Structures are given as C-alpha cells and as structure tokens.
C-alpha cells in the first residue's frame, strides 16, 4: 500500500499544480474586476452602465466559481483513491495479522503492535497528502510572486556627491531616448532648466510629458542619452541624495491610512510639530484639518478616501513644502479639482514654488503662460520651444 500511495501522491500533485495556476490567474482577474467596479461605480452610474458593469462582475464571479469547482473536482478522484488504498490496506493487514496470530506465528504483543501501526500509519499519510496539496497551491502563488521579485531593480551604485549650484544647469536632458518595452515614447529629447527658472511641458496626451518627469525622478532609467542634475548623471548619484533634491506633486494623490500629521510629516521626518503646522498653513489646508474630528491626529481612510480631491492635493503640497527640496515637479496638479479648490491649490503651489526650480506639466494656459520656457512635446519629440508670446506667434500645436 505504501508504494501505491507514493505514486498516487506524485501523480495527484502534478494535477494540483496545473489547476492551481489556472485558479490563481482567475483569482487575480476577479480581484481586478471587483476593484474596477468599485472605483468606477460613479462613472458607470453616470453613463447608465451599471447593468453592463454588474454583468461583467457577475461573469467574473461565475468563472471563479467554475474554476474553483474544477479544482476541487480534480482533487476528489485522488482523495477517493487514497482513502480506498488506505482502507484496503487496513482490511488486508488486520485479517492477515489475526490469521497469523491464530496459527501461533504472531505473539499477542506483536499483533497489538501491528494493529496500532496500521491505524497510526494511514492517518498521518492522509494528513500529509492534504498538506502536500496545500503546499502545491502555495507554490503556484509563490511562483507568481517570485516572477515579480525577479524583475531587475534600478541599480543604485552611484557614489558621486551632488555639487551645490554652479555654472551647470540645474536639470539637463541630453539626447534622451526612452521606451516602454518596444514602444518608444521619447526620442532624442534635449533641454536645459536653469536654477530658479520655470520650464513647462505641454502637448497632446500620451506625448511623453509625464515620462520626462518620471525619468528626472529616476522611476526608470533612460535607454539612451543622459539626465543630469547640476552636471552629474543621475545614475552616478546615490538615489537617496537625488530624492532629497526633488519634490513631486502628482495629479493623482495618494495618502496613507494614517493620521493627517504623519502624512504631512513624511516630507521630512525630523520636522517639529510647529513646522508641520506651518507647512499646512502655507498649503492652505490648516483650517479644514482643524475642523476634522481629531484635527491633525485624525486617521484618514485608505488613499485619503475620506477627503475631497482638493483637500488631498493640498495635504500633498504641504508635504512638499515641508520637504523644501530645490527642484519641484508639478504633474497636472490642478487638472482634476473644482474651481473653489483650484484657487486654494494655486495659492499653495505659489508658496511651494518660491525660490525653486520648476518643471511643470499642464494643459491649462493660465498654469504655464508665465513660464520662462515652454516645450511642446508630441509623439516623443520636442516640436516647439519658447515662451508664451513666441509660441503664440508661431504656427503649430501650441
């Protein structure tokens, strides 16, 4: 029986692994569908698509149910076979032992030992099989996690100290080309941004504006060319030193499920409480924070869900004001807020940007018309460059 059980376990685990991969993929698809439905429920309701979206979600639940049932059905025959072999083993061994005892070939002590061995052996075998099945399912999950962890990290081997401001531009892109996989999104882009100046990036969506900001922040590395800060290639600078020089206000703000105070203080963890309050005042968010149930000690929901979009944006600006980095990137900072909040945010941005080097990504004219230089980016290339008056006088996208 032991030999048969061994081969049953080997064969069943192969089937378990194959079905586990399928079930894991469907579980991920269901999670995405649920998140998509919940986050987009307002849009779906506005466009009268709740029925269609609900049907898609129901379909995902049905597929998950089907895959789970198929997984359990794939295990049932092996479990039945295992129990059958264990049962037959007991049925054969016990009568044989009694027969041998009756013939005087087994002592009573040995007979009791055999009976106890039979009952104690097959129980752990069944338990071991169940645990092996669970481990196989976990192995399928770990394979997917390991695939993510196996992705190459950005190398952080820079050892050069970042110099203080000198004759070199604060920021320079030199013949930069970048691609997401096979899709090239920037091609031979070059520009400079001097200290305490404002450079605006405009152009059609998908043209590569946000990619420029992400490359400067070193979320990715360029495929060709160089990104320099004060004359140093950012790949040669320790990543922590580079991050100390840059603050970024994102279009889509994320706040952590923590107190308002801690969400602002992460801009500079050694800041005093009064410095955090002052940053909040400059970001025009002190008053509404004090109206929250516990003021700065109020725990906000995941992602800042308990606050409006404008309130979240002002808290993120307070975080940047507290950090006081010399280079500020504004990525469509007022693109998705209402008019009332926009005026507060513009005041907060004015406080943030004083004495700073600015890289601004925007669609609205009033945001960038006073920029020292405006670059128009289309399909990954700079197609126009100049200040507002110069570009208005030219024929082109601007």
Task: Show where each model-derived region lies.
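A hydrophobic transmembrane-helix motif
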Residues: 1-13, 69-115
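Cytosolic ends of transmembrane helices, especially the final helix of ABC transmembrane type-1 domains
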Residues: 49, 73, 121-148
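An intracellular "coupling" helix at the cytosolic face of ABC transporter transmembrane type-1 domains
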Residues: 15-22, 26, 32, 36, ...
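ABC-type nucleotide-binding domain
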Residues: 165-398
């Amino acid at each position: 029986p032991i030999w048969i059980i061994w081969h049953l376990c080997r064969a069943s685990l192969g089937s378990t692994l194959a079905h586990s991969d399928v079930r894991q993929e469907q579980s991920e698809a269901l999670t995405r569908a649920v998140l998509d439905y919940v986050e987009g429920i307002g849009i779906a309701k506005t466009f009268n698509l709740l029925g269609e979206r609900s049907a898609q979600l129901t379909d995902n639940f049905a597929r998950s149910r089907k895959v789970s049932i198929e997984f359990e059905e794939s295990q049932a025959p092996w479990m039945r076979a295992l129990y059958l072999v264990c049962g037959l083993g007991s049925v054969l061994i016990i009568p044989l032992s009694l027969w041998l005892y009756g013939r005087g070939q087994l002592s009573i002590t040995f007979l009791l030992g055999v009976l106890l061995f039979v009952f104690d052996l097959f129980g752990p075998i069944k338990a071991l099989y169940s645990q092996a099945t669970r481990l196989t399912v976990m192995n399928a999950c770990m394979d997917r996690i390991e695939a993510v962890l196996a992705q190459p990290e950005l190398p952080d081997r820079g050892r050069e100290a970042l110099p203080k401001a000198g004759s070199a531009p604060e920021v320079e892109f030199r013949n930069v080309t970048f691609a997401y996989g096979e899709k090239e999104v920037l091609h031979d882009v070059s520009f400079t941004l001097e200290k305490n100046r404002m450079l605006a990036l405009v152009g059609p969506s998908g043209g590569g504006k946000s990619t420029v900001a992400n490359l400067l922040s070193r979320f990715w590395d360029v495929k060709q060319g160089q990104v320099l800060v004060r004359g140093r290639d950012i790949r040669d600078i320790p990543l922590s030193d580079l991050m100390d020089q840059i603050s970024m206000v994102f279009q889509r703000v994320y706040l952590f499920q923590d107190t308002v105070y801690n969400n602002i203080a992460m801009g500079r963890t050694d800041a005093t409480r009064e410095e955090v309050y002052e940053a909040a005042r400059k970001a025009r968010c002190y008053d509404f924070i004090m109206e929250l149930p516990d003021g700065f000690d109020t725990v906000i929901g995941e992602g800042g869900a308990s606050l409006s979009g404008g309130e979240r944006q002002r808290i993120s600006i307070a975080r940047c004001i507290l950090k006081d980095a010399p280079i500020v990137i504004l990525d469509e900072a007022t693109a998705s807020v209402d008019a009332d909040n926009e005026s507060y945010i513009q005041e907060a941005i004015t406080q943030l940007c004083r004495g700073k080097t600015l890289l601004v990504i925007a669609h609205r004219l009033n945001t960038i018309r006073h920029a020292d230089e405006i670059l128009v980016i289309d399909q990954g290339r700079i197609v126009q460059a100049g200040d507002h008056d110069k570009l208005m006088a030219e024929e082109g996208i601007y």
